[in-house]
A protein has these predicted regions:
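A carboxyl-terminal module marker
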Residues: 179-200, 206-385
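Short, solvent-exposed loop/turn segments at the edges of secondary structure
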Residues: 84, 133-137, 187
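Class II aminoacyl-tRNA synthetase-like tRNA-binding/catalytic domains
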Residues: 1-131, 142-143, 205-219, 228-230, ...
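Short secondary-structure junctions
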Residues: 40-46, 109-111, 164-174, 305-317, ...
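Short histidine-centered catalytic/ligand-binding loop motif
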Residues: 19-25, 138-152, 282-292, 359
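Amphipathic alpha-helical segments
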Residues: 29-44, 140, 153-169, 298-302
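Extended C-terminal subregions enriched in glycine
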Residues: 151-155, 160-190
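Long, charged, glycine-rich C-terminal linkers/tails
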Residues: 45-61, 172-183, 315-318
Length: 385
């Protein structure tokens, strides 16, 4: 079953500022992207071409022409944002690749160029310090006619990207690794991770990019002969890359309107923390139709939608417990007027504005808006006055 975006949801998605686009003003993300692109231009001594494409794409370009199977879970409306049976908001910047490959069909001679496809992608995602519903990505594809590209080229591409994102001069001792990874549009696919130190001192591997050799079927579907054409493909999340480079621990800061924070997002210097307002927590007891609805990505997406322009106040949404009717005390079932198949979900909201203090009353009103959007039960428990 497909859930299509309403016109309001679509307009609000399309109105969101793309931080990779200089047309809306300077942002650190553009500087980081420029560093990565120029590093690869130097590595290979080839020109680059940047494509800023409409985020509304043919579903076939987002999935089928990149080799995704018809039953792939990522197609589900629970995770992707469909506008109609054949059109969606792209879930990755790779959606622009099939049309790009089509445009190369007439190239007869030598060809070697880096294609850069940056922009917003649209997901339904969890709410926490590292996830938003519309993150930024870039696809970096080197396409070459009359020449081979192999795993050694991919390895040097990964090394150049790591050095561009986390230059050794500022990040001495940076460690990275690549592990095998399967993508429908690459062969010899790799996942690129960097080792980061968390605020509590622990080390953790974080994914920076996914990459691989361009798969022959993807070339073939655009009429390019894989015996003549070869390619390297790398996709990177730019929000995470900027956060790693600048030492930012909350993804919401990248869009902050707070002048103290905003001024620090014009360069790639290390972020100097600005004291944030205290976090306010609100716990909700929801009745949902079944346990499949108790999905942190699904609930996070609905909560963001309910809050609209206030969504940036929601720092985290956590599921604390999921209990079927049969396991609840009869008094609770009675009070909530639950049906046999229902589940009770205890949900915690963490509300923390980046630029103002939240009164209890304001927090209660935000809590109620989320509650009304998520709760499926017969009895409502609202707390705002």
């Amino acid at each position: 079953v497909k859930n299509y975006l309403s016109l309001t949801e679509l307009n609000s998605a399309l109105a969101l500022r793309d931080l990779t686009d200089p047309a809306a003003g300077t942002h650190a993300m553009q500087l980081l992207l420029a560093d990565a692109v120029s590093a690869l231009e130097r590595l290979w001594d080839i020109p680059s071409e940047t494509h800023r494409l409409n985020p509304l794409v043919a579903t076939a370009d987002n999935y089928d022409r990149l080799g995704y199977s018809p039953g792939d879970v990522t197609r589900d409306s629970r995770y992707s944002r469909h506008v109609s049976p054949t059109v969606m908001l792209r879930s990755h910047t790779s959606a622009g690749i099939p049309a790009l490959l089509d445009s190369l069909r007439g190239e007869q001679g030598l060809y070697d160029r880096l294609h850069v496809l940056p922009g917003l992608v649209y997901r339904r995602d969890a709410v926490d310090r590292t996830h938003v519903g519309a993150p930024h990505q870039v696809d970096l594809w080197r396409l070459k006619a009359r020449g081979l590209l192999g795993p050694a080229d991919l390895q040097s591409m990964m090394a150049a990207v790591v050095e561009a994102v986390l230059p050794a001069a500022d990040h001495p001792g940076v460690q990275w690794r690549s592990t095998p990874s399967t993508h429908s549009y690459t062969a010899a696919g790799r996942q690129l991770d960097v080792l980061v130190t968390l605020p509590d001192g622990r080390n953790e591997w974080l994914e920076l990019a996914e990459c691989g050799l361009v798969a022959a079927p993807v070339l073939r579907s655009s009429g390019l002969d894989p015996r003549r054409w070869a390619g390297l493909a790398l996709g990177m999340g730019l929000d995470r890359a900027v956060m790693l480079r600048k030492g930012i621990d909350d993804i919401r800061l990248l869009r902050s309107e707070n002048p103290e924070i905003r001024a620090q997002l014009l360069d790639l210097a290390r972020y100097r923390p600005v004291s944030l307002m205290p976090a306010v927590r609100r716990d909700l007891s929801l009745v949902l139709a079944d346990s499949a609805e108790a999905d942190v990505e699904l609930l996070g997406d609905r909560a963001r939608g309910a809050l609209g322009t206030d969504a940036d106040v929601l720092a985290a949404l956590e599921i604390k417990a999921v209990t079927p009717t049969a396991e609840l005390p009869p008094a609770a079932v009675d009070r909530l007027r639950m049906d046999p198949g229902d589940v009770n979900v205890l949900l915690r909201l963490v509300l923390q504005p980046l630029d103002r203090t939240l009164t209890d009353e304001q927090a209660n009103r935000l809590r109620d808006r989320v509650y009304v959007a998520l709760h499926r039960g017969k009895v409502q428990e609202l707390i705002a006055g």
